[in-house]
Amino acid sequence: MKRFLQPARRSLLRAIPWLVLAATLPCLPQPMTAAAEPTPINRPWTGPYGGVPPFDQVRVADLGPALEAAMKAELDAVAAIAAHPAAPTFANTIEPLERATRDFERVQTIYGIWGSNLADDAVQKVEREMAPKLADLADRIFQNQKLFDRIKVVYETRKTAGLSPEQQRLAWLLHTDFVRGGAALDTEAKKEMAAINQQLATLSTKFSQNVLKDENDALVIIDDAAGLAGLPESQKTAAAAAAEARGQKGKWVIQNTRSSVEPFLTYADDRALRQQVFEMFVSRGDGGGATDNNTTIRQILELRARRARLLGHATHAHWRLENSMAKTPERAMALMEEVWGPAVAEVKQEVADMGQIAAAEGATITIEPWDYRYYAEKVRKKLYDLDESEIVPYLQVDKLREGMFHTAAMLFDLHFTPVPEGSVPVFHPDVTVWEVKDGQGKHVGLWYFDPYARRGKRSGAWMNAYRNQERFEGETTTLVSNNSNFVKAPPGEPTTISWEDATTLFHEFGHALHGLCSNVSYPSLSGTSVARDYVEFPSQILEHWLPTPEILSGYALHVETGKPIPAALVAKIKKAETFNRGFKTVEFLASALVDMKLHLSTPTADPDAFERDTLAALGMPREIVMRHRTPHFNHVFSGDGYSAAYYSYLWSDVLTADAWEAFTEAGGPWDPAVAKRLKSHVFSVGNTVDPADGYRAFRGKDPGTGALMRKRGFAAAAE
């Protein structure tokens, strides 16, 4: 989906993508026998705010050696814990494990930032070299029998050892993660699982690099200004700037990113160009050449299925959901199927409305996927007298950022101030840094903001925690980032974005606030370290403040006049808030259902055919494509994070819709009592409590699907 949290899973190996990295290796990497020489990246972070990443000292040549040194140091620390002569306790086993990851996590954070934001050929070479070694590190720890035996003792005695509830939960979490990582397998099964993880590590890296190459290299060049007919001036300017940056001055370029493609599909009058841009975008990873991902997908699915069977599960989906809120694939499927029918019915009405407008304009066409956004915008104009091009000039990134800060202050008493220029290193000139304090002036953390697309930056939008909040050995404050791919305006001009991108901006800021509000003892339980189908709840709830009158009137300011968005336009936005929800729900659910069915089925030899057949069986409207087609589905195949778990956005939205009604029932979006409960029971507790219990404490009840159906405009289905 447009939002991508990275990474959400935090436990002993908070920074190791141990099951998520993934072309098949003939053998395991050689054992680590000696540490590489430490580099500047390996040193503890110094400077203000409890230390900050030394981005100004990073050399790509140091990334591999730094990781090697950090991995060796972590293995040594783990070996010492496993060999401790005293009987296992929380203090001599679990807490030392929390310490053991810190040095490695600092290095892996920098490595991950370069891989996500600055992935040139040199960085990608390091990724290919290090992916299997990182997987090997994780296996060495999870399969350390002496270490697991100690963790098991602490886990089994957790309720009688005088541990706090948070300590008991951490003991449970570590034991659960070790079992899920193969710690309880016999020797031969452990070897097989390690071999599987090696192959998955390289395959997933290959998948993501193929997608990134297609996104970097593919583009549509427009030579004639007539091809820009219908586009707002801001998009024409951005396309001209993109062309100039690629040595095509005097022309216009549509880049292969969602923030460039979707506005073009919405406004461009030239149907043939819309089709060309659409086909470029949906063909990422599916071009039949060196970057084609279909064989890689088949290999990943086969390996995941083998691993699940080794661990005693029927399918990868059953293994994946064991520790989720949904618990089983069947429960996740039931929710998706409940929503699918009403959403498809809504799409049929949306298409009928489009057909009427097309016919009235004399267009004798059948609505195709590259027409949907274009004619949907015309329907919006007809039904609601609302044209999104009217809204875009009011959606300046910098002003919306201030609106997010206002939201954080009103809800959670968090206040943002830019750090003194040059006081905190950044990894790219586009990045800005803000100090966050609470209402008493106490330092809470730093927020890094990297809003613009660039070559080498993966697509989408995401939040990272560079450092987690913790306090079991003194207070450690968090460092979080939000990263987006907005098309940057020419120098000196404000960048404006679409309504959908503005919603994404607030969504990702919700993830950042989840990290900034964290108030826990142990880093493995901190911030966003929660179940995958819960982690999207704090982010999705924050989206609801964007369309509030206070945010729009105060921060949606016209890019030329500086005047606030007119009240009449705000009213139109409110009236049209459920417009096109059929399309949005179906394109998401199609991706989520294909993801789940891929991981419930016998691995397919032809992912493209599986996708087509599954969508046909579901009754997928021909006018829509999946939001993420399988060959570029980074959520699912560039790592394990959202595999068999893309449904999580819908599961979380059940909570989101119900939680928003808590505000409306209390009188409005700024109700202080509801906001206090939201912070106390959701945003601040991390993974210290079961998410179902945390939600119940906030809301006073369990959620149902009625609020979700009302939110999406499927009122009849909600009754």
Question: What residues fall within each predicted segment?
Answer:
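Bacterial N-terminal signal peptides
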Residues: 11-30
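N-terminal secretory signal peptides that target proteins for export/translocation
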Residues: 1-11
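Short pre-active-site segment immediately N-terminal to the catalytic Zn-binding motif
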Residues: 487-506
